[in-house]
Amino acid sequence: MSKPEETSDPNPTGPDPSRSSSDEVTVTVADRAPSDLNHVSEELSDQLRNVGLDDSAKELSVPISVPQGNVETDSRALFGSDQKEEEEGSEKRMMMVYPVRPDSEDCSFYMRTGSCKYGSSCKFNHPVRRKLQIGRERVRERDEDVENPKLMECKYYFRTGGCKYGESCRFSHMKEHNSPASVPELNFLGLPIRPGEKECPFYMRNGSCKFGSDCKFNHPDPTAIGGVDSPLYRGNNGGSFSPKAPSQASSTSWSSTRHMNGTGTAPFIPSMFPHSRGVTPQASDWNGYQASSAYPPERSPLAPSSYQVNNSLAETSSFSQYQHQMSVEEFPERPDQPECTYYLKTGDCKFKYKCKYHHPKNRLPKQAAFSFNDKGLPLRPDQSMCTHYSRYGICKFGPACRFDHSIPPTFSPSSSQTVEARQVGANGNEDDSWH
């Protein structure tokens, strides 16, 4: 039996890397004898078997990496998201996620919230029962809130307006028996009077309050306070003004003058707000000398009688007294401020108690030696007649006017009636004489 010729390897230096393993196996099998084929097949089967085992081992040896960023989410992914499991299973999972270290200190964050962001790497103790106790406490508090919803006091019930929900309110109205006088007393403006509280600053400056009866501050009644130092009529810089005192003085002077008449008939009194025919007050500062007559003296339907003219001196003296007292009260003294130049010149100031300058009382201009007529206008015989007063019977300057406001000497009731008759005959309409 002849041996097969051995062929020399064309590449003695080593295997060609470009040739695959299958080519090498084919060449080897072709060159070998048939008796060696069984041995080669066994080697190939062993290699294939080992390759499958290595792949399966690699698949089994892949580590399961769990990130530590969100332990609670990872625990749900590992152990399921069902929240209705039994306590034993939840305790086991808690032990796996959060370490129990009896020798260490309790984790403060875990004791408060029932969770820990460090998870199994935390070095503190995590009692297993803590999270379960927190859940039970929350459920218990929720049940208590449902059973007792009226644990908090209703903040609207104890105000003046009360609670609009009434008995259906979910908050407590339990102080109704303990505080029967919860509704405060109201002043004449309908604002609450609270003696123990601080005075409402807006009300003390302006006399009104936008909060109304719900305001928690005190709103004293100015009629009960009275006096010159009433805080309701304070100026911007501390000055005070109370119109109550002048009104009382004026009412006293008018009443005393009324009783001075010996005939028993009340004399003519210049009213501050008269209701004469054809006159309608249009402003709050409408004065008596402006609204006392809307017609010329020769056309006035109510001509003054002789006793009214005779008693005018008594009326003017009381009016001048009232005016002087009012000027003293309504102009504030502010020693730390500059003096009001207009007040020093004229004795008057249009800002009155709101003026921020000083109004010294001892430097008031001297009262001129003249009297006033029955309308409160000055009688200055040495001056010319006031044209506005001679035409219309009123003067917008009032007592400060520098002209004369005496009754025209040609005035008489008969002449006024004659003038009226002429106008009625000429126009043919009685109403034309009044317009």
From Swiss-Prot:
Ranges of biased composition (kind: Low complexity): 247-256
GO molecular function terms listed in the Swiss-Prot or TrEMBL record: DNA binding; mRNA binding; zinc ion binding
Pfam families xref list: zf-CCCH
Native source organism of the sequence: Arabidopsis thaliana (Mouse-ear cress)
Subcellular location: Nucleus
InterPro entries assigned: Plant_ZF_CCCH (IPR050974), Znf_CCCH (IPR000571), Znf_CCCH_sf (IPR036855)
The keyword Zinc-finger is assigned to this record: yes
Keywords, in A-Z order: DNA-binding, Metal-binding, Nucleus, Repeat, Zinc, Zinc-finger
Membrane-spanning intervals of the chain: none
Assigned GO CC terms: nucleus
Region (Disordered): 1-91, 235-274, 412-435
Main location, first listed in the record: nucleus
Annotated zinc fingers (C3H1-type), start-end: 101-129, 148-176, 194-222, 334-362, 380-408
Name of the protein: Zinc finger CCCH domain-containing protein 67
